[in-house]
Amino acid sequence: MFIGQKKSQKINAAFLSENEKSKYSEKFSVWLRGNFFIPDARKFWVKPSVKYLSDYLKKNPVDIIVSSGPPHSMHLIAMQLKNKFNIPWIADFRDPWTNIDFYQDLMLSSFADKKHKRLELEVLKNANSVISVGKTMSEEFEKIIFDAKIKSENKNKFRVITNGFDSDDVSSEKIILDKKFSIAHIGTMAKSRNPKAFWKVLGELIQENKNFENDLEIKLVGKIDISILKNIEYFKLEKQLKKIDYLSHNEIVKVQQQSQILLLVLNNTHNAKSILTGKMFEYLSAQRPILCIGPKDGDAAQIIEETQSGVTIDFEDEAALKKNILIYYDLYKKNQLQTANTHIEKYSRKNLTKNLCEVMNEVVSSKK
């Protein structure tokens, strides 16, 4: 109750609705969530979970606790258990807390904002080690501790372990690529992830080049904000659009491997540099050229450059977009559109799990 939606629906401040205007009930739900469900809707798990796990730990001692969030309530559970039993604790962040892109959209009161930041600081201070999904996010967490003038005994407290891909998704068989010059985006495209310059450039190219118009196919798999569909319509790209609401994981893997280009659009928000979506690593496993639209000095751009898996272009750089799309199109026409994809194995989940085990062993050893 109190959410203005069906029980099966989730509230996402970054993507409220495909309707033109979000309903007042949805906006109220976001306000309610931000101001009363702190740090998140799982806050009511904390007390019973601490009680249950305390009973469990008394009978079954462990060497280390690892919490992963969001939801950040998981960190609050782990923090209480760490303090109660003096067990080393690693806090793993797959997304930021108060620096997440939609934080400003939660309509927080001053009290709620201060509480979020206080809890975040307590977690960062009390954890023996803090793992983040990317370099920029890790530096932001470290700055919070530095600004609070809190000294840490562990010089390597803040570590980076990215998301990754399943090695089983990397095909050893010969892939038959799409006959069309297909540009595929997999996943939700919220309003903040609308590449307006990209649609404009594609619209210009289909007007300038009849062959390009006939060859182009835009594949969007997942939920798409209405503003994006309107942009596509405005630039007369409806004939090239292939919109697919849902595919299974295996079907998505196939689409990624068969597409000529994989489109990665980062949210055009204040924290764009730190955004490292799990989707990017799945793109790496597909071994197709990645066209990333986002900051050229961001974490995603760094990995794309390191792995030679594609190109990153700033949000509004129409000239660079047109230049690189035409380069890819020329290679496509010559049947030479490939990518080097070097050093991608370091981002396999197997290797990343090995990195996590090393951090766990270090934390446990330092407490003995």
Placement of each model-derived feature along the sequence:
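A charged, aromatic-enriched C-terminal amphipathic alpha-helix characteristic of glycosyltransferases
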Residues: E316-A320, K333-E362
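Conserved donor-binding/catalytic core segment of Leloir-type glycosyltransferases
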Residues: I176-R193, W199-L202, L352
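Membrane-proximal helix-turn-helix segments that form the acceptor-binding/catalytic region
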Residues: S73-L76, Q80-K84, T98, S110-S132
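Carbohydrate-associated surface elements
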Residues: T136, I161-G164
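A short, active-site helix/loop in glycosyltransferases that binds the activated sugar's phosphate group
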Residues: K117-K157, A301
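Acidic donor-binding loop of glycosyltransferase active sites
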Residues: N128, L237-K242, Q256-S274
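Nucleotide-activated donor-binding/catalytic signature segment of Leloir-type glycosyltransferases, i.e.
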Residues: N209, D215-G222, S227-V253
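A conserved catalytic-core segment of Leloir-type glycosyltransferases
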Residues: M1-K47
